[in-house]
Swiss-Prot record:
Belongs to the cytochrome P450 family. Its main location: membrane. This is Cytochrome P450 monooxygenase polB. The keyword Transmembrane helix applies.
Amino acid sequence: MYSFFLVCPVAFLGFTICYLVYVELFPHPFPKSLPLVGFRKEIFSRPRASFRQILGSSQTLAEGYEQYGAAGRPYVVPDTTFQPQVMLPQNHIKWLSTQPESVLSSEAVRVERNGINYLPVKSDLKSSVLFIDKIIGKSLSQNLDLIQPDMYDEIRHTVDSTMGTDVASWREVNLSEAMSTIIDRTGNRILFGLSLCRNEVYLRILRCFIIFMGASTLLIGQLPPWFLRPIAGVLITIPTFIFKKLSVAYVRPLVKERMQSVSGEEDDQGPGKTSHDFVTQSINSVRKFKITIEGDVASYLAEQFLFLAFAAMATTGAAATNIFLDILSASPQINLYELLHLEAASIFKSEADWMSPSSMKEMINTDSAIRESLRKNTLQSRGLLKQVMPKDGIMLPDGAHVPHGMWLGVPAQAMQNDDEFYPNADGYDPLRFARLKADAEAECKDGPSSGKHLDAAHPSDKYLSFSYGRSSCPGRWFAVRLLKLIIAYIAVHYDIKPLAHRPKNFSFGDASIPSFTTKIMVRRRKQG
């Protein structure tokens, strides 16, 4: 037994050294005509450059963008996976986003970047992507007006319980935890209804699933040598699998009940009671689009809903934390939090206003503050990553040849902080898009509709926070409406002390993670 524990580390170390030597002597092919950024003249230069990207990826991308990307030139950067990537300039984005999957594949990147092969999933990626695109597009985005009352009701209940209702004294609240709680419960209310969103045991299990699922997708897909992935995959996937099974045990009976309810309504051949519950609408969409599901349908749907919940809640929670960090640390001259309070108070004067979709269109300043925060704080430093599929490679618009298997992408974080596209881009200008929208509406005869392209949920080739083109996030309209309601409710009902400075985000590989230790002081406002 002693010899076993001695031999294993020695063998692993030897294998690691051999792999590093192999990477140095036989590197992945990359375009020789493009400039390199992040590589140095040193022993084991390529492996060391890759290791530096674990904590320094955003800095490398920014340096490359400043030297080459801003001038419209592609460049090559190292990556934690030991596979160099080509970063394209902004003027290549429309070309990149319109290439067919057979030429530039986003699916191949998802499998590797998210560690799909090591996750506890039964369905294949194509099936999941098709399911999410259809369900989100038809069952959620088109029913936002109908589910807004439930969104508001759950936000009110959760914010009140999380931040308190004492108008006499201040209360210390962990911002990240508060946002996660609000997003988790409201998201579950929309997905699964009232029973699960207030089940404390289920919510704790789901939170553990989201944490381990996030760790799986973040760590496994960005681990340096490929041979570490199976090891890390086993270690991280075990708890992920356990919490997924526990979560499915709560969700599956609900799905089965909704399936029986839908079948019963069809058998009655009557209008029945139309339900706007997301699960029910999803089941209707599955039947309508004739999505083929092998095996137990209830288990499949429950699993898909859980992975959808993870994707929606993890990203929206991080975005909400970023937004409030920006709002509370904004320049005192702007008095931003009070400005948003006044806007919300002028719009939401009654319970009916909180449930009215038209109220959302009036939140010009809030929408602008959200878009500005998403612009400045991308959750990923790279965007639109795609893999070259043709065996003979492809030609970039500028004539450079990129070989088969290489990844192309855009340095989204660096691009969205370029003064060429956004004056004073390094600063947080919460009313930037409100001003631009007012200017666009003043110049155009179409009025308010002329500024829609500046809405927080509207992607462009200069605003990739929700990706772009065919890759655009299908749930972005839901996410922005949820964020608007949260900001409005908190601003109307709570005083919050400003932050002296904005805590820096932590970078790990491509991910930019907002502070999860920042605490804020809140107090319930006295309602006149």
